[in-house]
């Protein structure tokens, strides 16, 4: 999970 990254930048969303």
Swiss-Prot record:
Major subcellular location class: secreted
Known role: Specific inhibitor of store-operated non-voltage-gated calcium channels. Decreases store-operated Ca2+ entry and cytosolic calcium concentration in a dose-dependent manner in U87 cells. Exhibits anti-tumoral activity by inhibiting proliferation of human U87 glioblastoma cells (IC(50)=300 ug/mL). Also exhibits anti-tumoral activity towards human glioblastoma U251 cells, but with lower activity (IC(50) estimated to be more than 500 ug/mL).
GO cellular component: extracellular region
Source taxon at top rank: Eukaryota
Compartments it resides in: Secreted
Tissue: Expressed by venom gland.
Record flagged with keyword Nuclease: no
Name of protein: Tetrascorpin-1
Other remarks on this protein: Negative results: has no effect on proliferation of the breast cancer cell line MDA-MB231, colon adenocarcinoma cell line LS174, and liver cancer cell line HepG2. Does not induce mortality in mice up to 3.5 ug doses.
Organism: Androctonus australis
Annotated keywords: Calcium channel impairing toxin, Ion channel impairing toxin, Secreted, Toxin
Lineage start: Eukaryota, Metazoa, Ecdysozoa, Arthropoda, Chelicerata
Keyword Nuclease attached: no
Coiled coil: none
């Amino acid at each position: 999970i990254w930048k969303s």
